[in-house]
UniProtKB/Swiss-Prot annotation:
It is found in: Plastid, Chloroplast. The gene is rpl34. InterPro entries: Ribosomal_bL34, Ribosomal_bL34_CS. The keyword Transcription regulation does not apply. Belongs to the bacterial ribosomal protein bL34 family. It comes from Guillardia theta (Cryptophyte). NCBIfam families: rpmH_bact (TIGR01030). This is Large ribosomal subunit protein bL34c. GO terms for molecular function: structural constituent of ribosome. Signal peptide: none annotated.
Length: 46
């Protein structure tokens, strides 16, 4: 029997902590601003 893949988890992650989710709220935009200011290569950790 084949194992089931972890389908859908990436979509869930993206919906909660993706770029567009961050841009939606003022707090999320602050997160992005701080990560840009710190010089993070990746703004989103998904």
């Amino acid at each position: 029997m084949t194992k089931r893949t972890l389908g859908g988890t990436n979509l869930k992650k993206a919906r909660t902590s993706g770029f567009r989710a961050r841009m939606k709220t003022a707090a999320g935009r602050n997160v992005l601003k701080n990560r840009r200011r710190k010089g993070r290569h990746k703004l989103i950790s998904v």
